[in-house]
Amino acid sequence: MLLSPKFSLSTIHVRLTAKGLLRNLRLPSGFRKSTVIFHTVEKGRQKSPRSLCIQTQTSPDVLSSEKALELAQYKSKCTKQSGIILQLKQLLSLGNTKFEALTVVAQHLLSEREEALKQNKTLSQELVNLRGELVTVSTTCEKLEKARNELQIAYEGFVQKLNQQHQTDLTELENRLKEFYTGECEKLQNIYIEEAEKYKTQLQEQFDNLNATHETSKLKIEASHSEKIELLKKAYENSLSEIKKSHEMEKKSLEDLLYEKQESLEKQISDLKSENDTLNEKLKSEEQKRISREKANLKNPQIMYLEQELESLKAVLEIKNEKLHQQDVKLMKMEKLVDSNTALVDRLKRFQQENEELKARMDKHMAISRQLSTEQAVLQESLEKESKVNKRLSMENEELLWKLHNGNLCSPKRSPTSPAAPFQSPRNSGSFPSPSISHPDDLPGNQRQTEGISAGLTLPATAHHPP
């Protein structure tokens, strides 16, 4: 079955080439070798009858052994070929699946190509339509540009004509306004001069009143300040004199105490000296007695020993007495120092209290003086401010007078006291057809000047009066 022509490698090769899938097959590495083996086996099979015919003449044992070997070889070859055939079947199934996938991909690509062709056709048609529209739009744009140029030329000519007319109207208005404003300026100059003189007199009176009130308040403050300073000085001198008196009294009392203590100490010293003299005399008498006893008791050694012990005990007692005396002296000194220290501490506390009281008084006096100085500074600042305001007002009045004398004040605005008839008459007359039209160089400047003058003239009415 394995060596039949249906399953031979040559037939499989022919079928694959016929289908056109030989390129897609990827056989394993041992495929060509197996084909070569198959070809050699077939050739061996073709040649085997001849060899068998020759070998029939040999012994039957050799033939049986060779047949067994050949059978074993054929069996191994058959197993190998069956494995190769299975691999080829698997490769065929894989090739078929790949081919089906390729067909699906090709169909998909063809469908996409058809859609792309359809879109290309539609886009080409749209392009043709857009080109036609572009041509029409370009023609309309050219027409519109021509119309715009024509309109611009006509507009420029019209604007030039309007400018010429406007300039002529402006010149006429300037001449009329100049004629009108010259007469009005003369009237306003006279009115402003009269008002300026009135305000000047009023300001001078206010300034004189302010100076008088300032001088009187200054004198009053200086007098009160000097009186307060004198009172503070007197109080300070009185407190100092009282402190000095108390200090002298305490000093005298302390000196008296010292003198009394010195006298008591001197008495104690004299008493101690007399006691010391009596004790010395007693010691001398006792020594004489001791000497006499020693002379009498030279023969008794026990008595001598006892007398020596007595003398040593007396010496020890004397040393202890001296130490006790020194300690008493030290105690006396310590008591004196403690008493003096307590007295000094009391004096120190008293002086500290007095010093604190004096400091509190001085702080109060300093606070009062500072308050007075601040009040004086505030008054001086207010005076300076009032003087500056008065100077500014006087300068503004002088400037206004100078401007009025030089004739720079020419405006259609009326003053607070001027009548409204001169301003309404030219507007109602036929010589001024358009009251809202004004020259940009003449009217705003004059209006600003008149506004500044009216503001300067109304300042004195709202001037700051002193409190």
Curated annotation (Swiss-Prot):
Residues 106-401 form a coiled coil. GO terms for biological process: regulation of macrophage chemotaxis. The keyword Ribonucleoprotein does not apply. Residues 425-437 have a biased composition (Polar residues). InterPro entries: MTUS1/CCDC69. It is found in: Mitochondrion; Golgi apparatus; Cell membrane; Nucleus. Keywords: Cell cycle, Cell membrane, Coiled coil, Golgi apparatus, Membrane, Mitochondrion, Nucleus, Phosphoprotein. Residues 411-467 are annotated as: Disordered. The modification Phosphoserine is found at residues 373, 394, 415, 425, 429, 431, 434, 438. It comes from the Eukaryota. Homodimer. Interacts with AGTR2. Interacts with PTPN6. Belongs to the MTUS1 family. PANTHER family: MICROTUBULE-ASSOCIATED TUMOR SUPPRESSOR 1, TOUCAN, ISOFORM A. Cooperates with AGTR2 to inhibit ERK2 activation and cell proliferation. May be required for AGTR2 cell surface expression. Together with PTPN6, induces UBE2V2 expression upon angiotensin-II stimulation. This is Microtubule-associated tumor suppressor 1 homolog. The gene is MTUS1.
